[in-house]
Amino acid sequence: MRFHSRILLLITCLLCTAIAFSQVKITGKVVDNSGQPIEFATVRLLGTAVGTNTDTKGDYEMTVPKADTLMVEFSCLGYSTVTRQLIKPEGTVTINPKLYEKTLELEGVEITEYKKQTTGMQGIDVEMLKRTPDASGGSVEAVLTTMAGVSSKNEMSSQYMVRGGSYDENSVYINGIEVYRPQLISSGQQEGMSIINPDMVRKVDFSTGGFSAAYGDRMSSVLDITYREPEAFEGAFAASMQGGSLMLGHSTRHYSQMHGVRYKRNSSLMGSLESKGEYDPQYFDYQTSLVFKPMDKLRIALLGNVSINDYRFTPKNRETSFGTSEDVKQFTVYFDGYEKDKFQTYFGAGSVTYLFNDKGTDLTLQASGYRTDELVAYDIHGEYWLDQAGQELGVGKYHEHERTRLKMNVMDLTLRGNVGINQNSISYGISMRKEDIYDRSRQWQWRDSAGYSLPHIPDQVNVIFTESSSNDLKTTRIAGWLMDTWRFTSGVGYWSLNAGIRLSHWNFNKETLVSPRVSLGFVPERNGNLSLRLSGGVYYQAPFYKEYRQQLLDELGNRTILLNKDIKSQRSIQVILGSDYTFRALDRPFKFTAEAYYKNLSNLIPYEIDNLKLVYSGINSSKGYIAGLDMKLFGQFVEGTDSWISFSLMKTQEDLYGVKVPRPTDQRYSIAMFFTDYFPNIPRLKFSLKGVLSDGLPTTAPHLTRADSYVRQPAYKRVDVGLSYELVGKDNRPLSGFLSHFKEIWLGLDCFNLMDISNVSSYYWVTDVNNIQYAVPNYLTRRQLNVRLSASF
């Protein structure tokens, strides 16, 4: 019996050896012309059914039968097909093909096909950022606000809302590192510039929901930015009526550096606001990105940022007309006082990455630090009149005072890695974050209407509102995640499955969170133009500074801010179903995208929106839901230029103190368009248009909630247009002289708010002696022209 077993084992070994020697393993990485990996590329052996697909790192591996000659084909939608011939291959063969973007020529116009999307992340063309008319000064977020499900209500701000979420529910990453924005910003005038420098951006990925476990505890969206690494000496500069920017980059074999400086003054734009006075805003931003590669498998990267926003305003007067054509009211104010705000942020990060092999196995140790020093200080006194057709409705005085100082330090240490195993890509990480917060604030408001101090108490003179805070806090957060992306091909089509889990703990409230997330993408074999996506999971909004500041009232109505140690993370259980369909119409490519979503919300911390300021209750006292449908048609409406139109329907509601009310972000509909064109006889003259029509948001009077009462703002309507003329380009670049050193030079003219529509950002509430309140709209900017010059070299 033992003899027969040995014979059987010997035969099995011989057969396995024969099979092994009769097969060839083919591995490698598929990249584009810039060296970036291409995911979802098809690798197949011609003449057989053997094939595979690349993973998220562009890597592939397959075993094929041995033959004298093998033909291996590499293809991907939007790229040219490459074929490699192998003559008598043996053992393991490595092929690293480079695919070039596939274009068609129609009368000299290039038309590029569109890639399939099997995950919740969508890519955004960086080139579109350069010539987009943007009143905020040229930000990445300006393009985002035209995407389905994304909206903004203030053209001077780079903040945005996604699918019923607030400004605080969006996370932003630069080179894999989470970045933050100032916390005390309450208006677009104060904000300045986005932390993202568009001149330094190489890649933009954006998710409106259903993102993976690798991203932190936010409920709404992820904006993932990757900065470029210069290939040689290069630079870019821009100047306009709003400000200017300069970027310089340099590269050697083992080292690359990039530096960007931006300066902005919005005086001309703010001059169109109804509050007249001396606006003196100054915004400065410096960023640097350094990369060292002492060896092929080792990469050391440094990222730094200094941002200083200095906003000064001396108001003089304001005249606002509002109401209907048959009921016009006039609000007039004469001011005396001064506002001085300063926001200083400093950010630095360093990472060391070691690449173990060409299969995408790497390990990164990353450390980052963020510091913000914010000051809001104003003393403004005013006398106002409210008239209706010559009849005086109210007259009075008011005084507003605030001194708020916030200092915050956030230190983060992260260890993360990736492991490539066949068709699986495993990602993992663990992080520890320490937060140190210093908060001092005192603010009050006093009003006198028709000679009476409000609130009117005969033997006292009281302010209408007072609030103070004095808090110091040091906390630690720990998080970890593990996820796997599995891409494979079956008889019915191509599949992409991502499943992961994220764990986090915060020592302030002793809360531990478990966040499972999963997404599935499918491209049917019978219809390669169609792709389907299904994603879902449990997402949390971990409280950060503003959310757990709780207001406590004493017997005199004074408010004191305390930190709520019983606060819990807001929770969102999400399900998202989406599809893409690519097609050609008029011999041009188009892609139609539709996504339906539902979010069950619990442990909500109610808040109200005043312009850009979110005022939280500081307690978990609400629950609700968000449901909606997003649609987008993307394509070349004009040959050779990409445009799109998006349409969104959404409903969000919450149970607030026993009353069902719309949430502050209840934007029931939104239509947005980004359109590009060129003049046929002057192809160097480009035209771009950005238009938005979105429903108004519910709002309420100060110190009240929507459970008491609310009004809905008018719809936000805005159209911005821009003309750009190419002075120097790849087809008209001089061979000698000064201009020969430039790659591109563009001269542009923008018209912001083409229709000169007065949009409402918030309301100023006036109360007369009879305690009747009038909502006086605070209008945003009117029509403005902007001239800009940009160049790259």
Which role fits each region the language model picked out?
Residues 293-309, 337-509, 593-596, 644:
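Face-selective signature of the C-terminal outer-membrane beta-barrel domain
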Residues 80, 93, 115-170, 176-211, ...:
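Periplasmic N-terminal accessory/gating domains of Gram-negative outer-membrane beta-barrel systems
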Residues 317, 525-574, 589, 596-616, ...:
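Surface-exposed extracellular loop regions of Gram-negative outer-membrane beta-barrel proteins
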Residues 362-368, 374-378, 566-620, 625, ...:
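Membrane-embedded beta-barrel scaffold of Gram-negative outer-membrane proteins
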Residues 692-700, 725-793:
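C-terminal beta-signal and adjacent terminal beta-strands/loops
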Residues 402, 406, 410-414, 568, ...:
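Outer membrane beta-barrel strand-and-loop segments of large Gram-negative receptors
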Residues 490-492, 597-600, 617-701:
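Gram-negative outer-membrane beta-barrel transporters
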Residues 31-34, 41-46, 73-80, 89-133, ...:
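Short, acidic, small-residue-rich periplasmic hinge/interaction motif at the N-terminus
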